[in-house]
A protein has these predicted regions:
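Hinge/lid segment of periplasmic solute-binding proteins
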Residues: 95-142, 158, 167, 196, ...
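A structural signal for short loop-to-beta-strand junctions that line the ligand-binding cleft
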Residues: 79, 87-89, 117-152, 181, ...
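Glycine-centered hinge/linker elements that transmit conformational signals in sensory
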Residues: 170, 213-242
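Short helices/loops that flank or line small-molecule/ion binding pockets
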Residues: 74-87, 103-104, 151-152, 171-176, ...
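C-terminal lobe and pocket-closing loops
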Residues: 266-282, 293-384, 414-418
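Extracytoplasmic/periplasmic solute-binding protein
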Residues: 134, 143, 167-215
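Short, solvent-exposed loop/beta-turn-alpha elements that line the ligand-binding surface or hinge
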Residues: 108-121, 183-190, 204-225, 274-285, ...
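Conserved N-terminal structural module of periplasmic/extracytoplasmic solute-binding proteins
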Residues: 4, 10-12, 27-97, 242, ...
Length: 418
């Protein structure tokens, strides 16, 4: 069951390029049939706030709608949806955070709701597990290259396409006195730091686990190449690089202090927003697919989709109201009003400049974030055990040993390893 689930969800993730090219569909209207309570749990960034606000506009005297947008959503969702009735009726998920909800039976099939209220949805938005629709995808995401066009021009450099190029270009930019610290990345110990490793490792083409098993397989040449590259980049970063998460990166970028960074596509729009971004930096901000690594040919970044699910432990009335509100939240009208907030997977969306990087990842063959049920245990182990390495306190061999020890312990406790 879990392996089928993994393959099916991954297939949904890698269809992002096709989703973006999807055709038209009927426009949604905010006219919820019936009554109910809609309680949304999501991550906290611009695109999801747009969706939540649009969904909330459907509130009436008989339909109450609330939303909790928080970076802690992944930690909250399991316990909150386990309660009966569930604390939230809607969980906005990505292709990693849906897995525990599926494994624990905390979200419901959506086929009946799609048939009744989903006229505006495209077929490829329907994330199916074992033939049942379990989530509705509405945006593609991924970390990709942000670069300063003016700095490259002054240095006489082309847009880099590999991490090796980025390191060489950073040296040129520093030697020319254009910037002291031309690089930045999400190296804050925790989820962000682990994602940096996962992205680069995906670019090597190597497997995270032994074939058909939960045994860890990153202690290899590819794993060392990734760590070597991560460490090499810190030589061109501000000394406080350990404090940078994704949100902090945008602040550093807007201040004009960085020439290259790997950042989320969902945050690209903010860097060129004429209403809020530094005009000089915004005018010189460019986007491209994530770089390759170690002679690889595919962008070294995970491909993601974001979508919504409906809780199992709620009334059918609340489920129907929640589905209708969320369909309005991701409607073509919402997307038309906020075209640069995300790489939308919605009918009628025309990709703008902020979508270039995510589309480049998808068309370049970037792989979906791994969907094995034990991948979360590896991500957690990387989150904790790479901190000393990225700080320069231990070598790659020790870091890989530490990650394996932490992962093996968790995988045994979870029943994945003996």
């Amino acid at each position: 069951m879990k392996m089928n689930l993994t393959k099916t969800v991954a297939a949904g993730a890698v269809s992002i390029a096709a989703l973006i090219a999807g055709g038209g569909a009927a426009f949604a209207e905010c006219a919820i049939q019936g009554a109910g309570s809609v309680r949304i749990l999501s991550n906290d960034f611009e695109a999801l706030r747009v969706v939540n606000d649009a969904a909330a506009s459907c509130a009436t005297d008989t339909v109450a709608i609330t939303a909790n947008a928080t970076a802690e959503h992944k930690n909250i969702q399991g316990p909150a949806l386990t309660a009966n009735p569930a604390e939230y009726t809607v969980a906005v998920v990505a292709n990693n955070s849906i897995v525990p909800l599926l494994n624990d039976g905390l979200i419901r099939p959506l086929d009946d709701l799609v048939a009744q209220y989903g006229a505006s949805l495209q077929p490829n938005q329907l994330i199916k597990i074992d033939g049942k629709v379990m989530a509705i995808a509405f945006m593609g995401n991924g970390q990709h290259l942000f670069y300063r066009k003016d700095i490259l021009e002054k240095a006489g450099l082309d847009v880099p396409t590999s991490y090796e190029d980025i390191l060489a270009d950073a040296q040129v930019i520093k030697d020319m006195g254009l910037m002291e610290y031309p690089l930045a990345a999400s190296n804050k110990p925790g989820w962000d730091l682990a994602a940096e490793f996962v992205n680069m490792y995906l670019g090597t083409g190597a497997e995270f686990f032994a074939a058909g098993a939960a045994d860890l397989a990153i202690d290899n040449e590819s794993g060392r190449k990734v760590l070597e590259t991560m460490r090499a980049m810190t030589a061109f970063m501000n000394p406080d690089y350990l404090t940078y998460d994704a949100n902090e990166l945008n602040k550093v970028w807007d201040a004009g202090n960085v020439a290259f960074m790997q950042q989320w596509g969902s945050l690209a729009g903010a860097t060129i927003d004429p209403a809020t971004a530094n005009p000089e930096v915004a005018a010189n901000t460019g986007f491209a697919a994530a770089p390759t690594i170690g002679g690889g040919t595919t962008p070294a970044a995970a491909l993601w989709w974001d979508g919504f699910t409906i809780a199992q432990n709620i009334s059918d009335e609340d489920a129907a109201a929640s589905f209708q509100a969320m369909v309005h939240g991701i409607s073509p009208e919402t997307v038309a009003a906020h075209p640069d907030a995300a790489t939308w997977l919605v009918a009628g969306y025309t990709p703008g400049p902020a979508a270039v990087g995510v589309i480049g990842n998808a068309t370049g063959g970037a792989k979906a974030y791994p969907m094995q049920p034990y991948m979360g245990l590896l991500h957690t182990a990387l989150s904790a055990e790479l901190a000393d390495f990225i700080a320069g306190k231990e070598d790659a061999d020790q870091a890989l040993k530490d990650v394996k020890a932490a992962y093996d312990t968790a995988a045994k406790e979870g029943g994945f390893l003996k």
